[in-house]
Protein backbone atom coordinates (compact mmCIF):
# COMPACT_ATOMS: atom_id res chain seq x y z
CA UNK A 1 0.00 0.00 0.00
CA UNK A 2 1.11 3.56 -0.67
CA UNK A 3 0.59 4.94 2.81
CA UNK A 4 1.06 8.63 3.60
CA UNK A 5 4.73 9.27 4.33
CA UNK A 6 3.72 11.29 7.38
CA UNK A 7 2.55 8.08 9.08
CA UNK A 8 6.11 6.75 9.22
CA UNK A 9 7.21 6.40 12.82
CA UNK A 10 3.76 7.04 14.27
CA UNK A 11 1.86 4.48 16.32
CA UNK A 12 -1.79 4.10 17.23
CA UNK A 13 -3.21 5.24 20.55
CA UNK A 14 -2.80 2.58 23.21
CA UNK A 15 -5.64 2.67 25.75
CA UNK A 16 -4.97 1.38 29.24
CA UNK A 17 -5.79 -2.18 30.19
CA UNK A 18 -9.40 -3.02 30.96
CA UNK A 19 -10.25 -3.69 34.60
CA UNK A 20 -11.19 -7.29 33.78
CA UNK A 21 -7.84 -7.84 32.10
CA UNK A 22 -5.89 -6.50 35.07
CA UNK A 23 -7.91 -8.55 37.56
CA UNK A 24 -7.26 -11.72 35.57
CA UNK A 25 -3.53 -10.99 35.27
CA UNK A 26 -3.01 -10.19 38.95
CA UNK A 27 -5.60 -12.47 40.49
CA UNK A 28 -7.59 -9.59 41.97
CA UNK A 29 -11.31 -9.69 42.73
CA UNK A 30 -11.75 -5.92 42.72
CA UNK A 31 -10.01 -3.02 41.02
CA UNK A 32 -10.55 0.74 40.79
CA UNK A 33 -9.72 2.57 37.57
CA UNK A 34 -8.16 5.98 38.19
CA UNK A 35 -6.31 6.37 34.90
CA UNK A 36 -8.62 7.99 32.35
CA UNK A 37 -10.00 11.03 34.20
CA UNK A 38 -13.57 9.73 34.19
CA UNK A 39 -16.18 11.01 36.65
CA UNK A 40 -16.25 8.71 39.73
CA UNK A 41 -19.75 9.95 40.55
CA UNK A 42 -21.07 8.78 37.20
CA UNK A 43 -23.59 11.03 35.55
CA UNK A 44 -26.70 13.01 36.44
CA UNK A 45 -29.77 11.08 37.65
CA UNK A 46 -31.63 12.87 34.86
CA UNK A 47 -29.27 11.29 32.35
CA UNK A 48 -29.73 7.88 33.93
CA UNK A 49 -33.51 8.26 33.71
CA UNK A 50 -33.30 9.31 30.07
CA UNK A 51 -31.04 6.37 29.31
CA UNK A 52 -33.43 3.92 30.96
CA UNK A 53 -36.52 5.28 29.24
CA UNK A 54 -35.13 6.44 25.91
CA UNK A 55 -36.38 4.81 22.77
CA UNK A 56 -33.96 5.47 19.92
CA UNK A 57 -34.83 4.46 16.38
CA UNK A 58 -31.56 2.73 15.62
CA UNK A 59 -32.37 2.37 11.93
CA UNK A 60 -32.65 6.16 11.53
CA UNK A 61 -29.61 8.40 11.12
CA UNK A 62 -29.10 10.94 13.93
CA UNK A 63 -29.82 14.63 13.50
CA UNK A 64 -26.70 15.75 11.66
CA UNK A 65 -27.10 19.33 12.92
CA UNK A 66 -27.68 18.21 16.55
CA UNK A 67 -30.51 20.76 16.51
CA UNK A 68 -32.01 20.20 19.97
CA UNK A 69 -28.63 19.92 21.68
CA UNK A 70 -27.44 22.98 19.77
CA UNK A 71 -30.37 25.03 21.07
CA UNK A 72 -29.73 23.86 24.65
CA UNK A 73 -26.00 24.62 24.62
CA UNK A 74 -26.46 27.95 22.84
CA UNK A 75 -29.00 29.03 25.45
CA UNK A 76 -26.78 27.85 28.31
CA UNK A 77 -23.82 29.95 27.13
CA UNK A 78 -25.90 32.75 25.55
CA UNK A 79 -24.39 32.08 22.14
CA UNK A 80 -25.76 32.01 18.62
CA UNK A 81 -26.41 28.49 17.37
CA UNK A 82 -24.10 29.05 14.40
CA UNK A 83 -21.19 29.63 16.82
CA UNK A 84 -21.21 25.94 17.79
CA UNK A 85 -19.99 22.70 16.26
CA UNK A 86 -20.67 19.24 17.73
CA UNK A 87 -18.29 16.34 17.28
CA UNK A 88 -17.65 12.78 18.43
CA UNK A 89 -15.69 13.95 21.45
CA UNK A 90 -13.03 16.64 21.36
CA UNK A 91 -10.74 14.10 19.67
CA UNK A 92 -12.71 14.43 16.45
CA UNK A 93 -12.70 18.21 16.68
CA UNK A 94 -8.91 18.20 17.02
CA UNK A 95 -8.75 16.01 13.91
CA UNK A 96 -10.99 18.40 11.97
CA UNK A 97 -8.92 21.42 13.00
CA UNK A 98 -5.70 19.86 11.80
CA UNK A 99 -7.36 18.76 8.58
CA UNK A 100 -8.50 22.26 7.61
CA UNK A 101 -5.38 24.16 8.69
CA UNK A 102 -2.29 21.94 8.57
CA UNK A 103 -0.21 20.40 5.79
CA UNK A 104 3.46 19.90 4.98
CA UNK A 105 3.98 23.63 4.36
CA UNK A 106 2.78 24.73 7.80
CA UNK A 107 3.71 24.42 11.46
CA UNK A 108 1.86 24.34 14.75
CA UNK A 109 2.90 25.48 18.24
CA UNK A 110 2.09 23.68 21.48
CA UNK A 111 3.42 23.04 24.96
CA UNK A 112 5.13 19.83 26.00
CA UNK A 113 4.04 17.77 27.81
CA UNK A 114 0.40 18.37 26.94
CA UNK A 115 -2.49 16.42 25.42
CA UNK A 116 -0.88 14.01 22.96
CA UNK A 117 -3.56 14.20 20.26
CA UNK A 118 -2.50 17.69 19.15
CA UNK A 119 0.91 16.40 18.12
CA UNK A 120 -0.37 13.12 16.70
CA UNK A 121 -2.90 14.73 14.38
CA UNK A 122 -0.51 17.48 13.30
CA UNK A 123 2.11 14.93 12.30
CA UNK A 124 -0.46 12.92 10.35
CA UNK A 125 -1.13 16.03 8.26
CA UNK A 126 2.62 16.40 7.64
CA UNK A 127 3.02 19.64 9.59
CA UNK A 128 6.06 20.69 11.59
CA UNK A 129 5.38 20.54 15.34
CA UNK A 130 7.01 23.20 17.52
CA UNK A 131 6.94 22.02 21.12
CA UNK A 132 7.71 24.52 23.87
CA UNK A 133 8.66 22.90 27.21
CA UNK A 134 6.52 23.74 30.21
CA UNK A 135 8.07 25.86 32.94
CA UNK A 136 9.38 24.15 36.08
CA UNK A 137 6.04 24.44 37.88
CA UNK A 138 4.14 22.94 34.95
CA UNK A 139 2.89 26.26 33.57
CA UNK A 140 2.72 27.04 29.86
CA UNK A 141 5.66 29.14 28.66
CA UNK A 142 3.42 31.62 26.88
CA UNK A 143 6.27 33.96 25.92
CA UNK A 144 8.17 31.03 24.44
CA UNK A 145 5.10 29.99 22.48
CA UNK A 146 4.68 33.51 21.11
CA UNK A 147 8.34 33.57 20.05
CA UNK A 148 7.84 30.27 18.17
CA UNK A 149 5.08 31.66 15.95
CA UNK A 150 6.21 32.53 12.43
CA UNK A 151 4.68 33.06 8.98
CA UNK A 152 4.10 29.31 8.58
CA UNK A 153 2.23 28.87 11.87
CA UNK A 154 -1.49 28.14 11.49
CA UNK A 155 -2.52 26.71 14.91
CA UNK A 156 -1.46 27.32 18.51
CA UNK A 157 -2.76 24.86 21.12
CA UNK A 158 -3.40 25.69 24.78
CA UNK A 159 -4.79 22.97 27.03
CA UNK A 160 -6.37 24.80 29.99
CA UNK A 161 -6.29 23.24 32.55
CA UNK A 162 -3.34 21.40 31.08
CA UNK A 163 -3.33 17.63 30.82
CA UNK A 164 -1.25 16.09 32.44
CA UNK A 165 -0.04 18.79 34.86
CA UNK A 166 -3.37 20.38 35.82
CA UNK A 167 -2.13 23.97 35.65
CA UNK A 168 -4.73 26.64 34.87
CA UNK A 169 -4.10 29.91 33.01
CA UNK A 170 -6.17 32.85 34.24
CA UNK A 171 -8.41 34.67 31.76
CA UNK A 172 -6.38 37.91 31.94
CA UNK A 173 -3.23 36.01 30.95
CA UNK A 174 -5.08 34.31 28.10
CA UNK A 175 -6.27 37.68 26.82
CA UNK A 176 -2.77 39.18 27.04
CA UNK A 177 -1.50 36.21 25.02
CA UNK A 178 -4.24 36.50 22.40
CA UNK A 179 -3.51 40.20 21.97
CA UNK A 180 -0.04 39.26 20.66
CA UNK A 181 -1.01 36.36 18.38
CA UNK A 182 -1.37 37.24 14.66
CA UNK A 183 -5.02 37.37 13.61
CA UNK A 184 -4.52 34.71 10.93
CA UNK A 185 -3.26 32.11 13.44
CA UNK A 186 -5.94 30.01 15.13
CA UNK A 187 -5.63 29.60 18.90
CA UNK A 188 -7.29 26.47 20.26
CA UNK A 189 -8.29 26.78 23.92
CA UNK A 190 -8.93 23.19 24.94
CA UNK A 191 -11.08 23.44 28.06
CA UNK A 192 -12.05 19.81 28.57
CA UNK A 193 -11.53 20.21 32.33
CA UNK A 194 -12.70 23.81 32.79
CA UNK A 195 -15.81 22.83 34.77
CA UNK A 196 -13.57 21.44 37.52
CA UNK A 197 -11.78 24.75 38.18
CA UNK A 198 -12.69 26.00 41.67
CA UNK A 199 -13.96 28.61 42.10
CA UNK A 200 -15.43 28.73 38.61
CA UNK A 201 -13.63 31.38 36.52
CA UNK A 202 -15.15 34.23 34.61
CA UNK A 203 -16.84 32.89 31.49
CA UNK A 204 -14.52 32.47 28.52
CA UNK A 205 -17.14 31.91 25.84
CA UNK A 206 -17.45 35.55 24.81
CA UNK A 207 -13.74 35.64 23.90
CA UNK A 208 -14.83 34.59 20.42
CA UNK A 209 -16.55 37.97 19.93
CA UNK A 210 -13.30 39.86 20.57
CA UNK A 211 -10.87 37.37 19.05
CA UNK A 212 -12.05 35.96 15.72
CA UNK A 213 -9.09 33.56 15.66
CA UNK A 214 -10.08 31.57 18.77
CA UNK A 215 -11.94 28.29 19.17
CA UNK A 216 -12.85 26.94 22.61
CA UNK A 217 -13.25 23.18 22.84
CA UNK A 218 -15.39 21.50 25.50
CA UNK A 219 -16.63 17.99 26.20
CA UNK A 220 -19.41 16.02 27.87
CA UNK A 221 -16.93 13.23 28.65
CA UNK A 222 -15.45 14.59 31.89
CA UNK A 223 -17.56 16.29 34.56
CA UNK A 224 -20.80 15.42 32.74
CA UNK A 225 -19.92 11.73 32.89
CA UNK A 226 -20.74 10.86 29.27
CA UNK A 227 -17.37 9.51 28.13
CA UNK A 228 -18.89 6.57 26.25
CA UNK A 229 -21.46 8.80 24.50
CA UNK A 230 -18.69 10.70 22.66
CA UNK A 231 -20.07 14.23 22.52
CA UNK A 232 -17.74 17.21 22.29
CA UNK A 233 -18.21 20.70 20.93
CA UNK A 234 -16.43 23.83 19.79
CA UNK A 235 -17.29 27.49 20.33
CA UNK A 236 -15.99 29.90 17.70
CA UNK A 237 -16.74 32.65 15.22
CA UNK A 238 -19.16 31.56 12.51
CA UNK A 239 -16.47 31.64 9.80
CA UNK A 240 -14.40 29.07 11.70
CA UNK A 241 -17.45 26.89 12.30
CA UNK A 242 -18.39 27.06 8.61
CA UNK A 243 -14.95 25.86 7.52
CA UNK A 244 -15.00 23.00 10.03
CA UNK A 245 -18.46 21.91 8.88
CA UNK A 246 -17.07 21.35 5.38
CA UNK A 247 -14.97 18.44 6.67
CA UNK A 248 -17.22 17.31 9.52
CA UNK A 249 -18.85 13.92 8.84
CA UNK A 250 -22.61 14.37 8.27
CA UNK A 251 -23.91 12.22 11.16
CA UNK A 252 -21.01 12.35 13.58
CA UNK A 253 -22.82 12.48 16.95
CA UNK A 254 -25.29 9.74 17.85
CA UNK A 255 -28.97 10.20 18.63
CA UNK A 256 -28.58 8.80 22.14
CA UNK A 257 -25.47 10.91 22.74
CA UNK A 258 -27.35 14.08 21.81
CA UNK A 259 -30.29 13.19 24.06
CA UNK A 260 -28.10 12.36 27.05
CA UNK A 261 -26.05 15.55 26.64
CA UNK A 262 -29.23 17.65 26.72
CA UNK A 263 -30.24 16.14 30.05
CA UNK A 264 -26.70 16.43 31.39
CA UNK A 265 -26.32 20.16 30.80
CA UNK A 266 -29.71 20.84 32.37
CA UNK A 267 -28.62 19.40 35.72
CA UNK A 268 -26.12 21.97 36.98
CA UNK A 269 -26.82 20.98 40.59
CA UNK A 270 -25.18 17.63 39.86
CA UNK A 271 -22.25 19.40 38.20
CA UNK A 272 -21.75 21.58 41.27
CA UNK A 273 -21.80 18.48 43.49
CA UNK A 274 -19.14 16.88 41.28
CA UNK A 275 -17.02 20.03 41.40
CA UNK A 276 -17.22 20.15 45.21
CA UNK A 277 -16.40 16.45 45.58
CA UNK A 278 -13.44 16.85 43.22
CA UNK A 279 -12.12 19.90 45.08
CA UNK A 280 -12.27 17.97 48.35
CA UNK A 281 -10.36 15.12 46.73
CA UNK A 282 -7.63 17.50 45.61
CA UNK A 283 -7.34 18.75 49.20
CA UNK A 284 -6.74 15.16 50.33
CA UNK A 285 -3.76 14.88 47.99
CA UNK A 286 -2.50 18.36 48.92
CA UNK A 287 -2.48 17.36 52.59
CA UNK A 288 -0.58 14.18 51.69
CA UNK A 289 2.04 16.11 49.71
CA UNK A 290 2.66 18.51 52.60
CA UNK A 291 3.61 15.60 54.85
CA UNK A 292 6.50 14.50 52.63
CA UNK A 293 9.24 16.88 51.50
CA UNK A 294 10.22 14.66 48.56
CA UNK A 295 6.69 14.72 47.10
CA UNK A 296 5.86 17.32 44.45
CA UNK A 297 2.21 17.88 43.66
CA UNK A 298 1.57 19.94 40.55
CA UNK A 299 -1.20 22.57 40.82
CA UNK A 300 -4.41 20.58 40.31
CA UNK A 301 -7.32 22.25 38.53
CA UNK A 302 -8.78 19.29 36.63
CA UNK A 303 -10.14 16.00 37.97
CA UNK A 304 -6.69 14.49 38.39
CA UNK A 305 -3.41 15.06 40.20
CA UNK A 306 0.12 14.71 38.88
CA UNK A 307 2.37 13.59 41.75
CA UNK A 308 6.14 13.30 41.55
CA UNK A 309 7.42 10.92 44.25
CA UNK A 310 11.03 10.78 43.13
CA UNK A 311 10.55 7.07 42.41
CA UNK A 312 10.61 5.49 38.96
CA UNK A 313 7.12 5.88 37.48
CA UNK A 314 6.79 2.25 36.45
CA UNK A 315 7.50 1.16 40.01
CA UNK A 316 4.75 3.40 41.39
CA UNK A 317 2.31 2.32 38.70
CA UNK A 318 2.93 -1.40 39.21
CA UNK A 319 2.75 -1.08 42.99
CA UNK A 320 -0.64 0.65 42.87
CA UNK A 321 -1.92 -1.76 40.22
CA UNK A 322 -1.00 -4.81 42.31
CA UNK A 323 -2.95 -3.25 45.16
CA UNK A 324 -6.06 -2.74 43.04
CA UNK A 325 -5.69 0.78 41.59
CA UNK A 326 -5.04 1.54 37.92
CA UNK A 327 -3.33 4.92 37.42
CA UNK A 328 -1.35 6.51 34.57
CA UNK A 329 2.41 6.21 34.59
CA UNK A 330 4.15 9.54 34.21
CA UNK A 331 6.79 7.88 32.02
CA UNK A 332 4.40 8.05 29.07
CA UNK A 333 3.54 11.67 29.88
CA UNK A 334 7.00 13.17 30.15
CA UNK A 335 7.38 12.78 33.93
CA UNK A 336 9.60 9.75 34.64
CA UNK A 337 9.17 9.79 38.43
CA UNK A 338 5.49 10.69 38.64
CA UNK A 339 2.01 9.25 38.26
CA UNK A 340 -1.23 10.89 37.20
CA UNK A 341 -4.16 9.82 39.34
CA UNK A 342 -7.82 10.57 38.64
CA UNK A 343 -9.59 12.06 41.65
CA UNK A 344 -11.89 9.34 42.96
CA UNK A 345 -14.42 9.12 45.73
CA UNK A 346 -13.19 10.13 49.20
CA UNK A 347 -12.54 6.56 50.31
CA UNK A 348 -10.70 5.77 47.07
CA UNK A 349 -8.44 8.78 47.47
CA UNK A 350 -7.72 7.81 51.07
CA UNK A 351 -6.83 4.26 50.05
CA UNK A 352 -4.43 5.41 47.32
CA UNK A 353 -2.79 7.92 49.65
CA UNK A 354 -2.30 5.23 52.30
CA UNK A 355 -0.58 3.04 49.71
CA UNK A 356 1.67 5.89 48.59
CA UNK A 357 2.64 6.58 52.19
CA UNK A 358 3.70 2.94 52.58
CA UNK A 359 5.73 3.15 49.37
CA UNK A 360 7.58 6.21 50.62
UniProtKB/Swiss-Prot annotation:
Gene Ontology terms describing biological process: L-histidine biosynthetic process
UniProt cross-references to Pfam families, sorted A to Z: Aminotran_1_2
Cofactor(s) for this UniProt protein: pyridoxal 5'-phosphate
The protein's superkingdom reads Bacteria
Describe the reaction catalysed, as an equation. L-histidinol phosphate + 2-oxoglutarate = 3-(imidazol-4-yl)-2-oxopropyl phosphate + L-glutamate
Keywords per UniProt: Amino-acid biosynthesis, Aminotransferase, Histidine biosynthesis, Pyridoxal phosphate, Transferase
The record's GO molecular-function terms, alphabetically, read: histidinol-phosphate transaminase activity; pyridoxal phosphate binding
Is S-adenosyl-L-methionine among the key words of this record?
no
The EC category is: transferase
NCBIfam families in the record: hisC
Tell me the subunit arrangement.
Homodimer.
What family does the entry list? Answer: Belongs to the class-II pyridoxal-phosphate-dependent aminotransferase family. Histidinol-phosphate aminotransferase subfamily.
Q: What is this protein called?
A: Histidinol-phosphate aminotransferase
Organism source for this protein? Listeria welshimeri serovar 6b (strain ATCC 35897 / DSM 20650 / CCUG 15529 / CIP 8149 / NCTC 11857 / SLCC 5334 / V8)
Amino acid sequence: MKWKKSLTGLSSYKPGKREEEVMAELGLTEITKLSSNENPLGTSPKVAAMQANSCVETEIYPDGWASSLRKEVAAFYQLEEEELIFTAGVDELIELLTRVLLDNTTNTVMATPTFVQYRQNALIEGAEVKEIPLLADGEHNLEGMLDAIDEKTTIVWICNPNNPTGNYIELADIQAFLDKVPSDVLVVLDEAYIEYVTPQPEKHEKLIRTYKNVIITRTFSKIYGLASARVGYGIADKEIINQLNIVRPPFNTTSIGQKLAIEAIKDQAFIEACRTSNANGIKQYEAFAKRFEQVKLYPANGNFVLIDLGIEAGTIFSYLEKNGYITRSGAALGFPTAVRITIGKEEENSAVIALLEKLL
